[in-house]
Amino acid sequence: MLSIKFINDNRDYVRKALENRNFDVSVFDTLLSYLDKRGAAMHDAQIKRSELSKLSRQIGSFKDDKAKMNELKLQAANLKKDVVELEKNADEFDQKAYEIIISIPNISLDSVPVGKDENDNQVINTHDNLGRKLVSNVLPHYEIGNKLDIFDFERAVKLSGSRFVVFKGAGAKLARALQNFMLDLHTANGYKEYSVPVLVKPEILFGTGQLPKFKDDLFFMEQTNMYLIPTAEVPLTNLYNNEIIDLSQPVRLTGFTECFRSEAGSGGKDMKGIIRSHQFKKVELVKITSEEDWEFEFKQMLEQAKLVLEELELPYRELQLCTGDLGFSSRTTVDLEVWLPSELKYREISSVSYMGDFQARRAMIRYRDDNNEVKFTHTMNGSGLAIDRLIAAILENYQNSDGTVSIPKKLIPYFGSDKIAY
């Protein structure tokens, strides 16, 4: 959430930044109108209060002149009514302004390329890490998975409908191996592991920016007034909701959760396989830092997410998102996309995003600086990584000509064998 002071002090800058993010600037202009009216009402109320204070002092000097005293008392009563009315108006404009402010996305860093949509994203680097030769005619992950009997889509439909998957046998084992491998990798590099609830209160999703704007993308449990989390970013960041925390060292968190998304608006995209499911597995990385530390910590988080792909020897690329493709809460985002040879294209497997103090303002996460001044923290998060898509990438990039799938070397100790066979 942007601060009112920042908006008022940088109106032209914010307007242009929102325009670059494809935000309807007429809504922003309405916000400015409400802020101006709120400011005017508060200013007028202050003038009336000053007049009332002056009048109250005068009343005492007319004790012997009841007519004059009554006249002044009447004026004072009218001034009080004016103050109450002006303060009421200010509160109404303040509420209207707030309702718009919580719908306004974050302001991108000046270094983020201006663009309309995903077509304007910029490739930073491409990493051809695969230490083996691909077989010809690579089967899609869902076909090789069915042949190896590690998925059961039919029974998933029976249980829950479309966009769900049952992992079984070596498939379930591979998912568990990846989870443990990534958590070990992250905790060895300074992240503290957490196991968190997947059901959270509405105010928790507000804190990280999913509510109210993305309500339709979430699964709501009406009987409990709670939501299933779309990512562990939500509970991990909000562990410190409404707290003043010690930031003598940056807070570094990791955790595995099931994640849930309604995929509203995705239409018929990716109906086959495990690329886009209502429920999926993911290991998340979250950091809470000071403003001074964010850049170093962001670069380190990106390297940590990349390390998973490097260790698994999977080909991938880094993509700097443009202004028009940034997430709601993000100031800058680098996507990591893994190569899927059956599709001859890269697929997102991680988004590493820096949020500034945008989420901290919504969630009221604060710290004391060296001068004991209370400030909002800065937050960042990234997938570390999405397990279902990792499985798809391994099944395609590690296929063998005999129909088996090799296991990446670093994963073998976790999986217990070097391949998945019939």
Swiss-Prot record:
Any Gene Ontology biological process: selenocysteine biosynthetic process
GO CC field: cytoplasm
Any GO MF annotation of the entry: ATP binding
Stored PANTHER family: SERINE--TRNA LIGASE, SERYL-TRNA SYNTHETASE
NCBIfam families: serS
Assembly mode: Homodimer. The tRNA molecule binds across the dimer.
Name the record gives this protein: Serine--tRNA ligase
